[in-house]
């Protein structure tokens, strides 16, 4: 069981078999609505939109919505860590989604999240 950061999907799109196995070997798969939006925003065509949506559906990802609690926690993370560690709003939302849902976050971007002490970080090494 894990929530996946956007970078894991990017590794898969680049053909990284370790990232693909990570997804395949995780029984319960989650992603933040923020990650879903980032994936769609990064698409270069409607076909890539379709592919992304199909991938999410075919692998039974549960897309976790932005709730009031997640928004509040993300705001705290931005206030606490944006100046000292450079955390950006999108990463704060993803981290807050993981913490609020008591899920480990799988990412290869350790530096984006290392400041968030209450986050269970699972670092992926491509």
What are these regions (language model features)?
Residues 1, 95, 101-126:
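Acidic, PIN/NYN-like endoribonuclease modules and their adjacent C-terminal/linker elements
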Residues 1-31, 41-54:
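Short, well-structured N-terminal submotif of metal-dependent ribonuclease cores
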Residues 2, 28-30, 59-63, 104:
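Short loop->beta-strand "edge-of-pocket" segments that line small-molecule binding or catalytic clefts
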Residues 4-7, 32, 86-88, 109-110, ...:
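Histidine- and aromatic-rich ligand-binding microenvironments
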Residues 5-6, 39, 74, 98, ...:
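Generic structural signal for small/hydrophobic residues in well-ordered secondary structure
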Residues 8, 35, 70, 93-94, ...:
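Alpha-helix capping/helix-boundary segments
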Residues 9-10, 37-40, 114, 122:
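Nucleotide phosphate-binding site architecture
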Residues 62-108:
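Active-site neighborhoods of divalent-metal-dependent phosphate/nucleic-acid chemistry enzymes
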